[in-house]
Amino acid sequence: MPRTESLDQYLAQSFDRVRRGRRDGLNRFKVDFRASSLPVCPRLYHIYRRLPWAKRPFVQESFTGDAAAMSGTALHLALQRWFGLECQAFGRWKCFKCDVLVGPTAGVQACPKCQAPMIYQELEVEKSKLVPFTGHIDMVLVQPKTNRVYLLDFKTISPRKIFEVRQSGPYRKHYYQINAYANAINLGQQDVGVDHVDKVVLIYVDRGDPWITWAPVQMPVSRKVYRETLALIATAKRSIKEMIPPRGICSSTEDPDAHWCPVKNICFSPLLETMLSDEVQPRDVGDRDRTYDRILQEVNNH
């Protein structure tokens, strides 16, 4: 075999551009009431609803972001399959070839038509009277002897962040997300095959060495944190009626929660009001906005 050569300059520059690649995506940023976006920042939502569409920043795309997202999707599929094989994961299972859905039931199922192993279908959290958001649950485990129900959420991250979790505990936003799922089930608002969740578990998995480096974190379900989650949504919606920017969840642009914020450069500007429209963009459907304070009150009384 011949000796290796130094890369041609053209190739070296091309590879470097790919590794560092970053550009505006096709879509402008928006704020959705999804569990994966919790906790909702009231100030970000207010800016989103009053910033003219043409001035809203585009969602940034990057090679590293694409690589992380795609590897995360693949790891989720592998984790769900092997939790089904080894731990009788509870949920719905689908054969895409035959378009057959089975469950909710425990363990990887064979397709009744072609006998091929079926793929785990994440249980959906739907909006309801006390649940003003949507989302998908990564995994449910039911302990056979005690019927204890665990809600699992997989987070694929870098080795450095695994170290941070082991030192300082889970990321706040991740707990808000999985806790919201658990409360949605415990409030009796979801048809997912289980009627309660006893514990939530965040499983941080190293994208580079998923078979070696895990950092599982078990936590209780908190009604108090859920009420805070709903209060943030209610504050965001109410601010649009009052047309006054509310406080956000960050204290400065240096706050860790602000790192990926699409509007952090204008959020703390003393000239913020001059950048916003005097009209809601796009307009709300009025009746829908009035529900959030009532939802919070009903959860408090539940």
Each model region followed by its residue ranges:
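A signal for specific C-terminal beta-sheet/loop modules enriched in small/flexible residues
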Residues: P2-L11, M118-I119, Q167-R172, V285-N301
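Short, solvent-exposed coil/turn linker segments
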Residues: K30-A35, S168, G193, T291
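Short, charged/polar micro-motifs that form catalytic or ligand-binding hotspots
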Residues: E61, G65, A69, Q167-R172, ...
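Mg2+/Mn2+-dependent nuclease catalytic core
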Residues: G107-K113, Y120-R238
